[in-house]
Amino acid sequence: MSETGTATEKPLFGRPWIFIRGVPAMKFLPPEGPPEIAFAGRSNVGKSSLINALVGHKGLARTSNTPGRTQELNYFVPEGYSGEPGDLPPMALVDMPGYGYAQAPKDHVDAWTKLVFDYLRGRATLKRVYVLIDSRHGIKKNDEEVLSLLDKAAVSYQVVLTKTDKIKDVGVPRLIGETLEKIRKRPAAYPEVLATSSEKSFGLDDLRAEIVRTVLL
């Protein structure tokens, strides 16, 4: 277990975070600069809730019980930086539209999916993708497709199990083991699976510490 509030974590997670930009298409991406950490996952897997829990701000990333509510690449950074050269934030968190089911017209869903895939394939400052998997359902076919895309693009990713408070405690270690076995031969997968619960604040320190290590690499 990581130590909360270490010197390396303080600059990233010891201050308020703000929303800076929603990106509906690749041409609206900010200039490449600070390292980016992205969160991917099926619709309603809990991406926005996890980001809010990580930074300690419940209303930062917009959450909804309606799958497919996030429709853009949403950028969040620590507060206190002008964004001018020489005063850039140390990193950005990117909340991506969910893939899979969404209550929206098919052409909209197709556009979000293309945006996500184009971003994952072609962003030089993308340091790691955290692929969120609902612990109640495990890795599904559309998750496998995203993992394969990341493998082909040689983009480092790590699997994070969400909503572990919804399953029995004894089931978490088993699920971690099963998930590790599924990704064992994937070339771009980080060989450690994290288990989290935004509702119970479980596993958040471990995820924060992993993000810090990734950004500082």
UniProtKB/Swiss-Prot annotation:
Q: Which GO terms describe its molecular function?
A: GTP binding; metal ion binding
Q: Which GO terms describe its biological process?
A: division septum assembly
Record domain EngB-type G: where? 33-217
Source taxon at top rank: Bacteria
Asked if Acyltransferase is a keyword of the record, the answer is: no
Kindly list the cofactors needed: Mg(2+)
Query: What are the GO cellular component annotations?
Result: cytosol
Record-annotated residues binding GTP?
41-48, 68-72, 95-98, 162-165, 196-198
- Which CDD domains does this one have? YihA_EngB (cd01876)
Keyword Cytoplasm assigned:
no
- Which Gene3D superfamilies does the protein's record reference? P-loop containing nucleotide triphosphate hydrolases (3.40.50.300)
Matching entries from InterPro entries are given as: G_ENGB_dom, GTP-bd, GTP-bd_ribosome_bio_YsxC, P-loop_NTPase
Q: What are the record keywords, sorted? A: Cell cycle, Cell division, GTP-binding, Magnesium, Metal-binding, Nucleotide-binding, Septation
Q: Tell me the residue numbers annotated for binding Mg(2+).
A: S48, T70
Family under the similarity heading:
Belongs to the TRAFAC class TrmE-Era-EngA-EngB-Septin-like GTPase superfamily. EngB GTPase family.
What PANTHER family has UniProt attached to this entry?
A: ENGB-TYPE G DOMAIN-CONTAINING PROTEIN, MSS1/TRME-RELATED GTP-BINDING PROTEIN
What is the annotated role of this protein in its UniProt record? Necessary for normal cell division and for the maintenance of normal septation.
This chain's protein is named Probable GTP-binding protein EngB
In which organism is this protein found? Answer: Agrobacterium fabrum (strain C58 / ATCC 33970) (Agrobacterium tumefaciens (strain C58))
Q: What is the lineage of its organism?
A: Bacteria, Pseudomonadati, Pseudomonadota, Alphaproteobacteria, Hyphomicrobiales
